[in-house]
Regions:
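Nuclease catalytic cores that cleave nucleic-acid phosphodiester bonds
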Residues: 66-176
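Domain-level signal for Mg2+-assisted phosphodiester chemistry and nucleotide/NA-binding surfaces
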Residues: 1-89, 135, 141
Length: 176
């Protein structure tokens, strides 16, 4: 989401940014922030560009794992073909998020889940978390980036104000 706006987030401040409006109404402690992602594609004989992307990925993962109360969950990047066009798709990431949310809410580890997503694939997990007694806050970007059923299902919704998001604007690399 933030790549669209050329924002490099300050992950250390992200949890407080997301919790702030909720904490105005109820006291809320942070169990953990989970970051769901996957490593970039690497061909059998990686190009310099692929090696650079992997190095950046490893640096980010190391940074996130070093932040107190943060955990990284990695899926896999799968190479696919649509006719003659190659594309890449993240696999397992949505399932990992869903399993963690349902597991923690069912076990009573969390009373409030904060989700940054827009995909309707999360609807069953959010329903299960709510049935377990958790309140679900949904943060989303542009209106067209979120499924309306997901928006209607969440207990609380917040539209991300990119101007207040902790982070800094990065310059686009025109050579890419």
């Amino acid at each position: 989401f933030l790549k669209r706006y050329d924002i490099e987030p300050k992950y250390e401040e992200l949890a407080d940014y997301l919790l702030k409006p909720i904490r105005k109404k109820i006291p809320l402690d942070l169990l953990r922030c989970y970051f769901y992602y996957c490593a970039p594609w690497m061909s059998p004989e990686p190009t310099d560009s692929e090696k650079k992307r992997m190095e950046e990925h490893e640096h980010l993962m190391e940074h996130l794992e070093g932040i107190e109360r943060w955990a990284v969950r990695l899926g896999k990047l799968q190479r696919r073909w649509d006719g003659y066009k190659e594309y890449f798709e993240q696999k397992r990431v949505d399932v990992l998020l869903s399993v963690d949310m349902v597991r923690h809410s069912a076990a009573g580890h969390i009373q409030h889940a904060i989700v940054l997503a827009g995909d309707s694939d999360f609807i069953p997990a959010i329903e299960a978390a709510k049935e377990s007694g958790a309140t679900v806050s949904l943060w989303y970007g542009e209106d067209n980036s979120i499924h309306k059923d997901l928006l209607n299902l969440a207990d609380i919704t917040h539209k991300i104000d990119i101007r207040k998001m902790p982070g800094k604007k990065v310059k686009k690399d025109e050579s890419k």
